[in-house]
Amino acid sequence: MYHNDKKYALTNCVLLDGSEHMEPQTGKAVCIAGETISEIVDAQHIPAGYEAVDLGGKYVLPGLINMHVHLPASGRPKKKASDPKKLVKLITFCALTNRIGVSMCEGYAKTELLSGVTTIRTVGGVADYDTKIRDLAAAGKILAPRVLASNMAVSVPGGHMAGSLAYEAHSAEEAAALVEKIAAEKPDLIKLMITGGVLDAEVVGEPGVLRMQPELVKAASDKAHSLGMIVAAHVESPEGVMVALQNGVDSIEHGAQPSDEMITLFKQRKAFQISTISPALPYALFDRSISHATYEQQENGKIVFDGIVALAKANLAAGVPVGLGTDVGCPYITHYDMWRELHYFVKYCGVTPAFALYSATKLNARLAGIGDLTGSIEADKQADLIVCTNDPLRNLSALRELDMVVKGGYRIDKPQIKKMDGVERELDKFL
């Protein structure tokens, strides 16, 4: 069982507590009892009964929170695209294949944790795998992050991920009924696929074409809200963002070119954006001989990339919250590279490393509805922490190799991850 029943104190460290400016604090000890941070004290005043763990001057910060995860895929690029519908049909064929599928997703969740991500928010998965893994992780039966689970999403015929990671709704009534069906599995949120994406577009200039009509969006959102769940939506066009915000969506996943009206709607709805620069970058910036993208996919990738960045900048300037997620599972987007999304946020949106770290920890926790539980290093919060040798405020690549991951007090020293060398090599060209 992956539980901690000991008392220990992390000492001789530089503390970055998750607050917006991430001011480094020295001379402190983080005291952990069981799953929680019991107190933060001066290092010379560690309470009796706590084992002192000397970190040798290393950096301690909150565990990262990845707000946009698809557990069933590794991110390994393929020269030839496979049919996701056939793959999902194969993996859900019988009890044995389902067990294999859940086990595979458990492995990917473990990789997220070993990379320093102590909470994931899933936004489209196979069957009820997400909630199964959430419950196993919460019970300490598997080594995995905290999971905020969506299970299957709701799409429309011909829509994004329709028939694979999303059900198909043919009407507003069916959209609401599908939300009820998903809700029976006790997920934490509902995911809608409102527009197409880069791979769905058939001609240049049409990424994110509107697939789900406004009345379906409203019916699904209203039903989700009536059941106490927020609604996240895949959106990659200005029209799609407006339809989403006008009809009850709470979080815009990805984004598109902003307008004044759009930003006003974000504020009125108290909605937020989850910026996902990572999946657009390979399509937009890689040579096509490497990405294996068609000309249309590359050009549309550039449109989506520019739209996500532009909306994030506009939202930041207007005070609209912008959280971070990787869209892991897309080609070249692995379960161990959340740190790259922070780096891209700095590079393309102009924020500081401190603000990127805050966004991926305390802010993401608040947007996910778990700000009272995790996201910062404070007394009575969950002991979800990471430790690195180098200063992430100077270079976020310090998060690439960690010395320790702590999830709910359970300590993992020197976490090891098998990485994809070719993927690392290509992505490193764009640091």
Where are the regions a protein language model picked out?
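Active-site microenvironment of metallo-dependent hydrolases
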Residues: 1-28, 33, 41-43, 91-92, ...
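Metal-associated gating/positioning segment near the N- to mid-region
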Residues: 59-136, 215, 247
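Divalent metal-dependent hydrolysis catalytic cores, especially in the metallo-beta-lactamase
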Residues: 94-95, 105-130, 144-153, 187-201, ...
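Short, acidic/polar
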Residues: 101-109, 170-183, 236-240
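Active-site gating/metal-coordination segments in enzymes
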Residues: 158-215
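Active-site core of metal-dependent hydrolases
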Residues: 199-309, 318, 323-330, 350, ...
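His/Asp/Glu-enriched, well-ordered alpha-helical/loop segment
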Residues: 226, 295, 306-389, 431
